[in-house]
Amino acid sequence: MKPFLSIIFCFLVLGVDSQRWFQFMKEAGQGTRDMWRAYTDMREANWKNSDKYFHARGNYDAAQRGPGGAWAAKVISDAREGFKRMRGRGIEDSRADQFANEWGRSGKDPNFFRPPGLPSKY
């Protein structure tokens, strides 16, 4: 049901024509994988004050895929921040995370948020 709703959403709201919606969905899937990779890297690194960097990097990588990737990054980021707010996390931290998310999606360098000493692997 969810994939069907996504396709309808693409047609009606985003105005994706019939020849581009496959490309859009492919980009969205790739963007979702980029966001997941940034999340798993953040968990693996377990580095203090690195979450903004990984937020920006995941959104940047996803948005580089195209409109579908940028859409997936926005949906995932907004859902993640909404979930954090429901759990009682501070609004200031959420605003800072959203700033990093938008920074990455806009194509700006995510290394702006890179904490000192973070291994070059990331």
Curated annotation (Swiss-Prot):
The modification Pyrrolidone carboxylic acid is found at residue 19. Residues 1-18 form the signal peptide. Expressed by the liver; secreted in plasma. Residues 100-122 are annotated as: Disordered. GO terms for cellular component: high-density lipoprotein particle. It comes from the Eukaryota. Its main location: secreted. Pfam families: SAA (PF00277). Keywords: Acute phase, Amyloid, HDL, Pyrrolidone carboxylic acid, Secreted, Signal. It is found in: Secreted. GO terms for biological process: acute-phase response. The keyword Protein transport does not apply. Major acute phase reactant. PANTHER family: SERUM AMYLOID A (PTHR23424), SERUM AMYLOID A PROTEIN (PTHR23424:SF29). Apolipoprotein of the HDL complex. Belongs to the SAA family. This is Serum amyloid A-2 protein.
